[in-house]
Amino acid sequence: MRPRQRTLTGRDQAASAFGGILLKLCDSVGAPMAALVDALGETVDYAGTHDPFDIRVAAAEWQLALRELQACSIPGWHDAHQVFVRGAKRSFALIALEEGYAIVIELVTHSFSVSHRALGEAIRELCIEAGLKVPQSYVADDGWTRVEVKPSRFDERKPEALWFSGGWCPLELLGRYTNDDLSTGEVGFRVRLITGAEVNLVREKLGRWYAEDLPMFR
């Protein structure tokens, strides 16, 4: 059974495009919360299951921690663009963007990483919405987009159809997709659409599917 997606209800501000992007990020990686915070520590928007006030406080505190880290004189720390902090009860990821903006993500329990595909998609969409340049360190993940896939009735890890241009598009499996970016528990395929386009599909550990350079999204 597919997990129920989070919603934008129970908020203390009107939903924005930023909130929708962060909501999808939370759903993609199972995160309890995610927030976009500006250089002054103000939360632009957020998503998650926590109280909005708690999300705002956490976002401001971690944005300050990221700023302090980037201001220190230790070699390699001042240009940190991605920081993971693991605590006894909660863990967080801090993602630096242009002009002092940052994404603060509370990680799923016992996790110390986040899907680079989900993160790359969120960064791309947030930067487009905010008029920011995508950081160079995330350009390599710019081609991945989360998609809906109908799995084979014989094997849920094998794709049968892709939701494409308003309908289910049958897929022709050409072979396995193998690359260093595949993590433990992930499986990839090279597929052909009925349009003749060939794309890479990856199923991540949480059952989310991602397509690389899908024509309708590029």
Predicted regions and their residues:
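Acidic, low-complexity cytosolic segments
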Residues: 1-33, 40-138
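Generic low-polarity alpha-helical segments
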Residues: 34, 65, 166-170
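Generic beta-strand hydrophobic packing signal
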Residues: 34-35, 83, 162, 176
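Acidic surface patches and DE-rich sequence motifs
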Residues: 38, 87, 97, 193-195, ...
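Cysteine-centric segments in proteins
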Residues: 136-218
